[in-house]
């Protein structure tokens, strides 16, 4: 990875007179992490005012439908409720053959075997939240075991939560080691790292968390668990997109984005789409690199595409 080369050269050059920093702090120095929250708010306002309307059309809404991670992460989930969700995804293909199916079904790993045995639609990924979601606070052995078992049961993508407390204590090495170990447990499965942006306090922290997560092995960065007071915001997504772009420019490695939590309206979804389009461009506008974690949005998108209220999901 190009970035480590930069860092090694950098360390070699400075080691005799600078206090020894670890390679993670060194990585952060290669990026602009001093970000003004007010500037970000203004930039987002401008995008919403000037650009979102360009994407307010049926084609984009179809694309968004195909980017949805149909999510059920409730304490009340049961085999029955999850099976009902899978059957809707199975039926959707028959009922709306001209519309794209959702990108994934996202659930707790106890349901993975059930989902993988009952899902009949090709190309719908099975996503599990692993590693003691949503707090991430469990022993590493437990987190690794949960992840390996999920993959074994048929999960095709894994969502984990960054250890937020370690990040806020500036234990960047601990953060990266944890993420790297989880990545190892995922094997070939793409891994999304949830930054829990609503708990990070400011744009600079969101930028730092994004960089550390990518550097430690994230294939996607995701805004939120949906379990905290503040979930996804356009401002957080804007900063995350900037980080993804800078990381791509430096390393050539493309990282995906998943806004999730509190995406309640079609306009919310269009806003995230527009931010990605403006900052990252066309290359990210496929359902491989752009995902929306939501449950309630699916019917709203479907209703707008069809032109009447639909409660399919």
Predicted feature descriptions by range:
Residues 105-107:
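Short, hydrophobic beta-strand segments that form beta-sheet elements in well-ordered domains
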Residues 52-67, 74-100, 110-257, 264-295, ...:
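Alpha/beta enzyme core
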Residues 18, 27-31:
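Polar/charged low-complexity regulatory segments
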Residues 3-19:
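Histidine-centered metal-binding segments
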Residues 299:
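Metal-centered catalytic cores of metalloenzymes
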Residues 18-21, 36:
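Anionic, Ser/Thr-rich low-complexity intrinsically disordered regions
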Residues 46-47:
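N-terminal basic/disordered segments at the start of proteins
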């Amino acid at each position: 990875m190009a970035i480590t080369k930069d860092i090694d050269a950098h360390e070699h050059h400075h080691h005799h007179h600078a206090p020894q920093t670890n390679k993670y702090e060194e990585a952060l120095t290669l990026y602009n992490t001093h970000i003004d929250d007010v500037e970000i708010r203004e930039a987002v306002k401008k995008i919403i005012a000037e650009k979102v309307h360009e994407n307010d059309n049926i084609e984009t809404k179809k694309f968004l439908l195909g980017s949805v991670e149909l999510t059920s992460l409730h304490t009340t989930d049961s085999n029955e409720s999850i099976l009902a969700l899978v059957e809707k995804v199975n039926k959707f293909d028959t009922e709306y053959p001209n519309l794209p199916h959702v990108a994934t079904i996202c659930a707790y790993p106890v349901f993975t075997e059930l989902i993988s045995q009952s899902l009949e639609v090709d190309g719908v990924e099975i996503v599990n939240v692993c590693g003691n979601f949503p707090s991430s606070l469990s022993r590493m052995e437990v987190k690794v075991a949960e992840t390996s078992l999920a993959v074994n049961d048929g999960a095709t993508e894994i969502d984990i939560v960054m250890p937020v407390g370690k990040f806020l204590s500036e234990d960047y090495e601990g953060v990266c080691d944890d993420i790297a170990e989880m990545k190892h447990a995922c094997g070939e499965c793409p891994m999304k790292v949830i930054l829990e942006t609503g708990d990070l306090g400011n744009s600079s922290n969101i930028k730092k968390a994004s960089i550390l997560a990518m550097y430690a092995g994230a294939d996607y960065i995701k805004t939120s668990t949906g379990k905290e007071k503040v979930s996804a915001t356009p401002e957080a997504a804007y900063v995350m997109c900037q980080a993804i772009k800078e990381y791509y420019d430096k390393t050539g490695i493309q990282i995906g984005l998943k806004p999730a939590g509190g995406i309640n309206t079609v306009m919310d979804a269009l806003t995230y789409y527009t931010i990605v389009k403006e900052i990252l461009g066309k290359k990210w506008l496929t359902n491989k690199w752009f995902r929306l974690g939501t449950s309630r949005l699916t019917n709203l998108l479907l209703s707008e595409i069809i032109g009447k209220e639909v409660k399919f999901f």
